[in-house]
Amino acid sequence: YEKKKTKQQDDTHKDKIFNYGYQGKYNWTYDTTSNYQLKFDETQLKYYLDYQGPQRSSVSYERSELNPTTANYSSQVFNFRGTEESIQAAQGDYAFVNGDRPQSINSLFSSTGRQFNGYVITETTQLRFASSFSADFKNHAIMVGVEYDQRNLSGYTVNPIGLWERMRNLTNIHLAEFDTANPIIIAGTSGSLEQRYYRYLYDASKQNQIDKSLREALGLSVDNQSLINTDAFSPDDLKLSMFSAADLLQTGQVGSALVDYYGFDYLGNRDKNSTNLDKFLNDKDDKGNNTLHVGAYKPIYVAGYIQDKFDFKDLRFNVGVRIDRFDANQKVLKDPYLFQEAYTAGEKSEGKPGNIQDDYVVYVDNFRSSTPEVIGYRHYDEKTNTNTWYNSEGKEVSDPKALLGADGKLSPWIKDADFADKNPFSVNAFKDYKPQINVMPRVAFSFPISDIASFTAHYDVLTQRPTDGIMRFDPKDYYFINNTSSNPFLTNSNLKPEKTIDYEVGYQQVLNQKKNAALKLTAFYRELRNQITTQTLSNAYPKTYYTYVNRDFGTVKGLSAEFDLR
């Protein structure tokens, strides 16, 4: 049994993640009463003053000594300027605001004061049992062995410097439009014009958890319409729990996901449970936010082997077989082109052409329609990782664009359209990983041709498990796939071991009477199967993406010569 835990962090700030990238307080206020514009009311035939929204005052800077080198940049700017018109203007004058750090020099060298941006915890446990037995029986040397290996891999990562910009981007965005239908009329007096003041339209659906938490920290109600200045908070005022998991994981935001985790929750607390997709989609915290728990990666490897070395007349044999069983112990997509449940031709057989098999996926013009029209079918070959497309008449089509639906996309006939509109994937679109059993025979023999020459040959099969990083199942990737503007890259939890089949023959001969010189010639042929490569899964639903697949096949042929002189 072995347990290993590592932690990578800044040597000064350590786990105080809001200290990373903090430069100080940037203070400003909002004038919410005087920003009006003269307008004419065509209905009432009179002029009035129309409210145009709050105006922000100039920005002042209150230095912090947590990161003194980068704070020097900002101090120099504000000592010269006094104030700046905005945060963006300060950045334009090369001041660093919270969440900034100096850029690298030509992507080669770190600039003075460039802050380390990372807080990483990894935890790995391994339970391994191995046993072997050997015995000589007459002219046989027999060896038998078994092996069991179960690992538990967990990891947690925060990119803390980006937290400040993420707060800036996620606050106040629910207060974007004025409630012009319900103006507050301030009647004009003594010849002054009527003023029309507007409150914001409060859009609760767009209010992020960090916005709610900051308002609570300021003693404000959640629906208060004050505009928050996130750069006026100090690190001591903030906790990571003020964010929701979605706040930190939103890949549509600048800087992408700021946390990553498996075997931990998004706050860095150890979570020993396995990934449960139903809980991932539905479990919520006490604030009503999805917790998005991801369990540890727990692959299981079992192997057994037997080997026999023996002589038969002049032949010397080494014969054995090894059987490996690899279980990734995680969920995989039933069909890598579908994140939702879709009807097959067997389930919607009316009008099905005779050559269309029952397991082919049905495609329609609009799966949200009560009477969708079938426009084609798709057959996925798991062995070759390829699709074959057919039109509604059962004729094979080379370009699936011919099957585009009413929305300009290839639309599988989704079983539950309402669920698909609200959830990025369905639990029922996944299945358990099928354990891979590999039988690896090994045969080698040699025999003397004469006192000075011999011949050798062997046949060998080897397999190699996929590395953890390219096949660990992470439901967060599927959950946020629609937040990305480009086609994302997802790991493939359904990868199989790579296989090498090796054939080799050799000839060796002593070249002189002293027997201190020898020549060895070897010829070999290798087949490389199930090689892992990248592939674009075009027209997947809900989005095209890139991933790893077992697809490549290769052969290696060679001839070697070796001269040995002693």
Language-model region placement:
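Surface-exposed beta-strand-to-loop junctions
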Residues: 109, 420-422, 539-540
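Outer-membrane beta-barrel domain signature, strongest for Gram-negative TonB-dependent receptors
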Residues: 1-163, 515-520
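Short strand-coil-strand connectors
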Residues: 136-138, 313, 512, 566
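Outer membrane beta-barrel strand-and-loop segments of large Gram-negative receptors
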Residues: 128, 484-496, 502, 514-566
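Phosphate/oxyanion-binding active-site loops and adjacent basic polyanion-contact surfaces
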Residues: 121-125, 297, 556-560
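Extended low-complexity acidic/polar segments
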Residues: 8-51, 196-197, 204, 213, ...
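Structural signature of Gram-negative outer-membrane beta-barrels, strongest in the C-terminal barrel
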Residues: 124-126, 143-158, 164-171, 175-280, ...
